[in-house]
Amino acid sequence: MYNCAIILAAGKGKRMKSSMPKVVHKVCGKEMVNHVIDNVRKANIKDVNLVIGKGSETVKEHTRDRNVTYSMQEEQLGTGHAVICAEEFLKDKKGTVAIFTGDAPLITNETIQELFEFHNSGKYAATLISSTVQDPTGYGRIIREASGEVKKIVEHKDCNEEELKVNEINSGMYCFDIEVLLNSLKNLNNDNSQGEYYLTDVIEITKKSGDKVGAIVVPYEEIMGVNSRVQLSEAEIVMRKRINHKHMVNGVTFIDCESTYIDVDVEIGNDTIIYPGCVIQGNTTIKEECTLYSNSRICNSVIGSGVIVENSVILESHVGEGTTVGPFAYIRPETKIGKSARIGDFVEIKKSTIGDNTKVSHLTYIGDAEVGSKCNFGCGTVVVNYDGQRKQKTIIGNNAFIGCNTNLISPVKVNDNTYIAAGSTITKEVPEGSLAIARSKQINKEGWLDKKGLLKK
């Protein structure tokens, strides 16, 4: 059986008060429309078409790596009109098409699979997703036959007294036999107060043709649409609970899961402990038995097993197993830190490689450098990598001892097994086995204060 999907992503989203199309706003680090696309793909649906409108180039930019096709809805004339705009996508296809909305990011791949299975096994012409709620005010009601089949969808304003008591509501997500859908679209009109073409009318047209219409009921959170910043925040809360619950089931400890913020694509190994206030973003992988103390942010990075991070920021970098980072360290993009290293407080590292067992304990800047293993950086060391026009490279070998308050003026090389005296400004290569001293000779002028009349009596 051939299955495909159409995702409606042309809405303007006026209530978002944004210059961006609504569907590219992110929930837990991923655009809403990409949540829907990815879950459709997880349900083994390969052919996906996005109906786009205002801000189409922005939507394309955010979805071009998803291998989808696009249909253009120049004017927003209703959900039915949006599907009409995708008729070319459905042309010459036979099978089943599901229709989802790009602003409902909480739909799961399990529900999508269930929708197709229910629709195809029951040989329905149309199947919709519904939900039961305590307060259905404002929603279209699902009215069923005695057999359980869907009889009709009635908008709230059109409900009679009995229909108002129904608490099963329409989600706006459907599954259709492609041929039935295309035939029904031919009979769709905009004879209503809004002058729009409604997809709900296709259900009525299908039913009048004598075809079967079914519905599956899912939790309300799965059909939540996002039309405002408030609803975006509500969707974020639901998604965050799902993400954190998944990690806890997989063996991750959260000291306070409600104040821990993890993006949907993050991977975390078991026996890792995460303290409140941590933010883990993007395509980050954290291996087993790590400890992330409060107020740490990690983005698009790989953290090895047994790493400890405390009150620090790690961006687009790799931290080797057994290393400690922080407190208050800043690991900038393209940094690779080896195993069992120590990156201490108020240390900034940028676009550098740090070898195994190297210690950079405090108040140090390292940029555009290659640092070997078993090195020690004293407090206040600075790699001076910028000459005013471009960044220069510094190379430090193994077993180098860099004394406190040292400036390494790039480009420069410090070879293996070297010592640099505290307070030195190094501008030339330091040979292996050497002690480098580059500071002014101390001069003591005895009695100077008394001669100047500065000695306090």
Curated annotation (Swiss-Prot):
GO cellular component annotations of the record: cytoplasm; membrane
Region (Pyrophosphorylase): 1-229
Bound cofactor: record note: Binds 1 Mg(2+) ion per subunit.
One MF annotation (Gene Ontology) recorded for this entry: magnesium ion binding
Enzyme Commission number, as recorded: 2.7.7.23, 2.3.1.157
Residues the record lists as binding Mg(2+): D103, N227
InterPro entries: Bifunctional_GlmU, GlmU-like, GlmU_C_LbH, Hexapep, NTP_transferase_dom, Nucleotide-diphossugar_trans, Trimer_LpxA-like_sf
Location of the active site: H362
Cofactor: Mg(2+)
N-acetyltransferase as annotated region, ranges: 251-457
Catalysed reactions, as listed in the record: alpha-D-glucosamine 1-phosphate + acetyl-CoA = N-acetyl-alpha-D-glucosamine 1-phosphate + CoA + H(+); N-acetyl-alpha-D-glucosamine 1-phosphate + UTP + H(+) = UDP-N-acetyl-alpha-D-glucosamine + diphosphate
Binding site for UDP-N-acetyl-alpha-D-glucosamine: 8-11, 22, 73, 78-79, 140, 155, 170, 227, 332, 350, 365, 376
Linker as annotated region, ranges: 230-250
One GO BP annotation of this record: cell morphogenesis
EC category: transferase
Coiled coil: none
Pfam families reported for this sequence: Hexapep, NTP_transferase
Cellular localisation: Cytoplasm
Homology family: In the N-terminal section; belongs to the N-acetylglucosamine-1-phosphate uridyltransferase family. In the C-terminal section; belongs to the transferase hexapeptide repeat family.
Function of the protein: Catalyzes the last two sequential reactions in the de novo biosynthetic pathway for UDP-N-acetylglucosamine (UDP-GlcNAc). The C-terminal domain catalyzes the transfer of acetyl group from acetyl coenzyme A to glucosamine-1-phosphate (GlcN-1-P) to produce N-acetylglucosamine-1-phosphate (GlcNAc-1-P), which is converted into UDP-GlcNAc by the transfer of uridine 5-monophosphate (from uridine 5-triphosphate), a reaction catalyzed by the N-terminal domain.
Assembly: Homotrimer.
HAMAP family hit by this protein: GlmU
Protein name: Bifunctional protein GlmU
The organism's taxonomic lineage, starting at the top: Bacteria, Bacillati, Bacillota, Clostridia, Eubacteriales
